[in-house]
Amino acid sequence: VVEKFARPLAGAVLTTLALVAAVLVSPASAAGAPPSAMARTVYYSASGYSAEADQAAQIWNSRVPNLRLVRGGSATIRIYATTGGGSRAYPCGLGCATIYIDSQDVAAGHSSLRIVAHEVGHGLGLPDNYNGVCSYLMSGGSAGTSCRNAYPNSQEANRVNQLFAGALTASAVDSGVYARG
């Protein structure tokens, strides 16, 4: 009786192992595709502070392997210039925000690149951290006008990388309004 079931069972196990091996050695992994090949693409547009938006995208792309910010397409992160009211972001989910960069903040001496990169951070799922420490991008204006750092620190970059790896759903992202205080 055991021999009657052993041969078909062994065949089924071998077939399952072959299928698993085929999936694990897909053409992408066999070709040694870089991790960025799996990055989630988020499109952005910038009618104001365009050069800063492009630089901010390069910064985030260099620090977050699971994210690829690209200008154009059906933009879900939209950046506009405004006068008055403070620089602010209105997140609408992970990889989605309407951002206003206040020219008065720039005129007051704040780095326009830091402001744009900070506000984009909200669209990527990060909250404000008004601790006044310049090495924290999300400390925003609390770090003062002398702070020129436009790069997320490793903690901030790792958090965005987790979010875009699918470790958390978009509903886990704070969708509050962020305005410079």
Stretch-by-stretch model annotation:
Residues V1-G32:
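Secretory targeting and sorting signals
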Residues P35-A46, C96-D102, G140-G141:
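Acidic/histidine-rich, surface-exposed loop or edge segments in extracytoplasmic proteins
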Residues Y43-L69:
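A short alpha-helix/helix-coil micro-patch that ends at or immediately precedes a cysteine
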Residues W60, R114-D128:
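Active-site recognition of the HExxH zinc-binding catalytic motif
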Residues V64-S74, L126-V133, S171-S175:
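Surface-exposed patches in mature extracellular/periplasmic domains of secreted proteins
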Residues L67-Q104:
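Short, well-ordered secondary-structure micro-motifs within conserved domains or adaptor modules
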Residues I99-V116:
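Short pre-active-site segment immediately N-terminal to the catalytic Zn-binding motif
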Residues H110, G123-A170:
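The catalytic-center signature of Zn2+-dependent metalloproteases
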